């Protein structure tokens, strides 16, 4: 992604409603266990790794990779030494060595996503688990995707079919951020109609910006309610889509 947005995200990701709620949802679906060897693909500055330590995981069992030198430096500064600068489609770590692999908003940045999924499959132990979140629906495509260097957005069927082709057994699939889907869709459509799709790279902007504290709190509350609902049901649409699988 553009460097200016990477730096902004590093500042935002701890408390911003989107990043904060997504980490909680991912952890809830991943069900990590003490002693498991865990890999976070696209670990950024290590906030998910931090959250995992807060629920009993040790830094020694946590691993991460990211394409950003600066992100991995931040991980090292936080004490996560098993973090490396690597390409998410060609992770050079021991095969069949991880119990759990998490990739939240990473696969869409990789041009050859099928190669990446095959690579991730090879890294998991037999019976190992994977949780993947990606942006949903090309109808939501906007300058936000451009500045973040996304290659695509997915339907759940597209994501699941590619996961199955790599060999994963699907345990759960669906969408996340259901309640905010329509407002976000409308905002992006209006931006595109206003000429957002014709902006130069210098004029494009990301949707993720600091939110006023009351707004941030309300949006976190909405996604907390959704997390509760997702314990019992799957949702038909959302801003993101996911699958949970096993090897």
For each predicted feature, which ranges?
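A structural helix-start
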Residues: 69, 110-114, 134
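Conserved S-adenosyl-L-methionine
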Residues: 168-178
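A C-terminal cap/extension of S-adenosyl-L-methionine-dependent methyltransferases
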Residues: 2, 180-247
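A short glycine-rich, Lys/Arg-flanked "PGG" loop and its adjoining helix->strand segment in the class I
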Residues: 114-129
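Conserved N-terminal segment of class I S-adenosyl-L-methionine
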Residues: 1-96, 100-104, 117, 212, ...
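A short His-aromatic
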Residues: 105-109
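Short, glycine-/aromatic-enriched active-site segment of Class I SAM-dependent methyltransferases
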Residues: 9-11, 130-152, 156-162
